Curated annotation (Swiss-Prot):
Substrate binds at residues 164-166, 201, 208-210, 264, 292, 298-301. InterPro entries: 6-Pfructokinase_euk, ATP_PFK, PFK_vert-type, Phosphofructokinase_CS, Phosphofructokinase_dom, PKF_sf. This is ATP-dependent 6-phosphofructokinase, muscle type. Homo- and heterotetramers. Phosphofructokinase (PFK) enzyme functions as a tetramer composed of different combinations of 3 types of subunits, called PFKM (M), PFKL (L) and PFKP (P). The composition of the PFK tetramer differs according to the tissue type it is present in. The kinetic and regulatory properties of the tetrameric enzyme are dependent on the subunit composition, hence can vary across tissues. Interacts (via C-terminus) with HK1 (via N-terminal spermatogenic cell-specific region). It comes from Pongo abelii. The lineage of its organism: Eukaryota, Metazoa, Chordata, Craniata, Vertebrata. Glycans are attached at residue 530. Its EC number is 2.7.1.11. Catalyzes the phosphorylation of D-fructose 6-phosphate to fructose 1,6-bisphosphate by ATP, the first committing step of glycolysis. The modification Phosphoserine is found at residues 133, 377, 667, 775. The gene is PFKM. Transmembrane segments: none annotated.
């Protein structure tokens, strides 16, 4: 990219005006998006306006449309809801209302509109855009606007960001607010679980989702529910019988509680609603269990946005500004959305159409079609739920294989969820599943036992590692490990852990030359707070650590805001990998994040101090600086603290916090529970296939490179990659992958902190078309 192109982003918005509004139901993370739109808009030289109270503010004009400043979006990131207000607006549905809205925009020279809301809000925006030229000619005829004003505002650019806790919009994997809503639900499920266990109760939990069962489905995966009712997949006609049998089976196996999750729009095959009360009455009447209903309601919309939603909102906000300013009269109104971890632009009306098609398919009782249209991610969730909740392990173990599961490295939240789904999917497939305590050390010492179905009951929501985990590598103990593989007849190995799990995998590959016993398939599931395992964009546990850091940063910022003129320097974990520091910097609104992956000098430190000196002259008199623990051996946390203290004398004072091992603890977030559960299921499916493939002459012999893999999330898919092939992509000295996708997000962090830098637009989203899944097509 040339310097001219770089420079173009800083002048892209000169002479242009952008209005941002939030409409429809509020969602956590909307404020992060508003903040990003305002700051990136100002960065490009554009004027940015808040439209208060959604479309109603657009119609009413006056003080509802105000110009935004850099400081006016400060301290917004950690707030739930929408600071600029939202309202359901009848006026905008009428042409007269849209005419007044057009007049208000033209008078202010605004030709770019960023709408953050659900499908109704975005459809309204598209209607507005398609009528724009007719509305202008009506205003001209009425003499309300001049010919010059009409020419200047000849076309309207519209970009939508989907803010909806239901995740009911087709074309995007996650809508802004969904992850935070899941946080609220899971907090409540965890709290209710303890009281239900004490009294041996059945809990019926109703969550939001009139036409979309995403929240209910992911909640059931994240808490190991016994049953879920969602509108897209109504239960079979004899569901009452099946449900009661399932609940009593769970109790017989020693469980003290049952959890049933119901989406508010749940229906049966004939379209008749299934209510929480119906389910409660059924369980009480047929089984006599003490059953309680909890309807969550608007709690789900409330509270602090999760780290995921803050980062999603910020990334989408940046993309929205770029899409608006690059727009021409010929570009269609688009939605900025997320696919895997990639930002994409999709034509707004294509997405709205597919979203309507889902509702239509459900109305016509074509439920398979509705499920396909929901997309790949939804279908994967449904398949894993069905396996874990509805398929029973076979009674006979004849012809079964033996698979061992272990944790390696440091503890990470979500490890237990991965172990649970690996064990249970293994049992469902008719295998014997062994669990190994204390990693490779335990494998060498024979700390191995067989796991049954209830062995891993209730593990999904528990943090840390219940099996015990060690950083020990296998090389020194190959003889003992080989002996135990033979003794316990282990035919496959699932290794859940961090960089040591990956390195251990490489050592096992090498050891195959000497020890035939090591020629068994193995798969590594990345699980570490550092997110530094080659072959995967995400690791189990990183999201939980990120949320822990965010919560702490919010509290520290609050303290600094009260004290005034104070800068906090916070040290995060991650070894040499700067993922936690960078992402927490984005999510908590840090002024700087020092990491090993982006070398810095004393001049950079001085520039940051000078930047904070300037910041103290504004209304925002506080600073937050993050430092990755191994970003530089000489510029330590103490050094940076001392430098800031000296240079800031008389202007600001400094404090330091080393967060330490609290980042490894805590209950796993919904993202980590769900991600770990799906990874475990996928790993075990692969393992069963590989064992069958490698079975020759009555024994397993696997010595091909593809029989030892890392299962990783790469851009938009879960893929198995041979560990040997990942060797070249690894910096072993610093225990990090050579290429890390999140480094591309660092310029956004700097721009949002008001640094004058170049923004490389080469990696921005381009317009794509929505891929539609029809009946009969396989989910990837």
């Amino acid at each position: 990219m040339t310097h001219e192109e770089h420079h173009a982003t800083k002048t892209l918005g000169i002479g242009k005006a952008i209005a941002v509004l939030t409409s429809g139901g509020d969602a956590q993370g909307m404020n992060a998006a508003v903040r990003a739109v305002v700051r990136v808009g100002i960065f490009t030289g554009a004027r940015v306006f808040f439209v208060h109270e959604g479309y109603q503010g657009l119609v009413d004009g006056g003080d509802h449309i105000k110009e935004a400043t850099w400081e006016s979006v400060s301290m917004m990131l950690q707030l739930g809801g929408t600071v600029i207000g939202s309202a359901r607006c009848k006026d905008f549905r009428e042409r007269e209302g849209r005419l007044r809205a057009a007049y208000n925009l033209v008078k202010r020279g605004i030709t770019n509109l960023c709408v953050i809301g659900g499908d109704g809000s975005l459809t309204g925006a598209d209607t507005f855009r398609s009528e724009w030229s007719d509305l202008l000619s009506d205003l001209q005829k009425a003499g309300k606007i001049t010919d010059e004003e009409a020419t200047k505002s000849s076309y309207l650019n519209i970009v939508g960001l989907v803010g909806s806790i239901d995740n009911d919009f087709c074309g995007t994997d996650m809508t802004i607010g969904t992850d935070s809503a899941l946080h609220r639900i899971i907090e409540i499920v965890d709290a209710i679980t303890t009281t239900a266990q004490s009294h041996q109760r059945t809990i019926v939990l109703e969550v939001m989702g009139r036409h979309c069962g995403y929240l209910a489905l992911v909640t059931s995966l994240s808490c190991g529910a016994d049953w879920v009712f969602i509108p897209e997949c109504p239960p079979d006609d004899d569901w009452e019988e099946h449900l009661c049998r399932r609940l009593s089976e769970t109790r017989t196996r020693g469980s003290r509680l049952n959890i049933i999750i119901v989406a508010e729009g749940a229906i049966d095959k004939n379209g008749k609603p299934i209510t929480s009360e119906d389910i409660k009455n059924l369980v009480v009447k047929r089984l006599g269990y003490d059953t309680r209903v909890t309807v969550l309601g608007h709690v789900q919309r409330g509270g602090t946005p999760s780290a995921f939603d803050r980062i999603l909102g910020s990334r989408m906000g940046v993309e929205a500004v770029m899409a608006l300013l690059e727009g021409t009269p010929d570009t269609p109104a688009c939605v900025v959305s997320l696919s895997g971890n990639q930002a994409v632009r999709l034509p707004l009306m294509e997405c709205v159409q597919v979203t309507k098609d889902v509702t239509k398919a459900m109305d016509e009782k074509k439920f398979d079609e509705a499920l396909k249209l929901r997309g790949r991610s939804f279908m994967n969730n449904w398949e894993v739920y069905k396996l874990l909740a509805h398929v029973r392990p076979p009674v006979s173990k004849s012809g079964s294989h033996t698979v061992a599961v272990m944790n390696v490295g440091a503890p990470a939240a979500g490890m237990n969820a991965a172990v649970r789904s690996t064990v249970r999917i293994g049992l469902i497939q008719g295998n014997r599943v062994l669990v190994v305590h204390d990693g490779f050390e335990g494998l060498a010492k024979g700390q191995i036992e067989e796991a049954g179905w209830s062995y891993v009951g209730g593990w999904t929501g528990q943090g840390g590692s219940k099996l015990g985990t060690k950083r020990t590598l296998p090389k020194k103990s190959f003889e003992q490990i080989s002996a135990n593989i033979t003794k316990f007849n282990i035919q496959g190995l699932v290794i859940i852990g961090g960089f040591e799990a990956y390195t251990g995998g490489l050592e096992l590959m090498e050891g195959r030359k000497q020890f035939d016993e090591l020629c068994i398939p193995f798969v590594v599931i990345p699980a570490t707070v550092s997110n530094n395992v080659p072959g995967s964009d995400f690791s189990v546990g990183a999201d939980t650590a990120l949320n822990t850091i965010c919560t702490t940063c919010d509290r520290i910022k609050q303290s600094a805001a009260g004290t005034k003129r104070r800068v906090f320097i916070i040290e995060t974990m991650g070894g040499y990998c700067g993922h936690l520091a960078t992402m927490a910097g984005l999510a908590a609104g840090a002024d700087a994040a020092y990491i090993f992956g982006e070398p810095f000098t004393i001049r950079d430190l001085q520039a940051n101090v000078e930047h904070l000196v300037q910041k103290m002259k504004t209304t925002v008199k506080r600073g937050l600086v993050l430092r990755n623990e191994k970003c530089n051996e000489n510029y330590t946390t103490d050094f940076i603290f001392n430098l800031y203290s000296e240079e800031g004398k008389g202007i600001f004072d400094s404090r330091k916090n080393v967060l330490g091992h609290m980042q490894q603890g805590g209950s796993p977030t919904p993202f980590d529970r769900n991600f770990a559960t799906k990874m475990g299921a996928k790993a075990m499916n692969w393992m069963s296939g590989k064992i069958k493939e490698s079975y020759r002459n009555g024994r397993i012999f696997a010595n091909t490179p593809d029989s030892g893999c890392v299962l990783g999330m790469r851009k938009r898919a879960l893929v198995f990659q041979p560990v040997a092939e990942l060797k070249d992509q690894t910096d072993f000295e610093h225990r990090i992958p050579k290429e890390q996708w999140w480094l591309k997000l660092r310029p956004i962090l700097k721009i949002l902190a008001k640094y004058e830098i170049d923004l490389d637009t080469s990696d921005h989203a381009h317009l794509e078309h929505i891929t539609r899944k029809r009946s009969g097509e396989a989910a990837v």
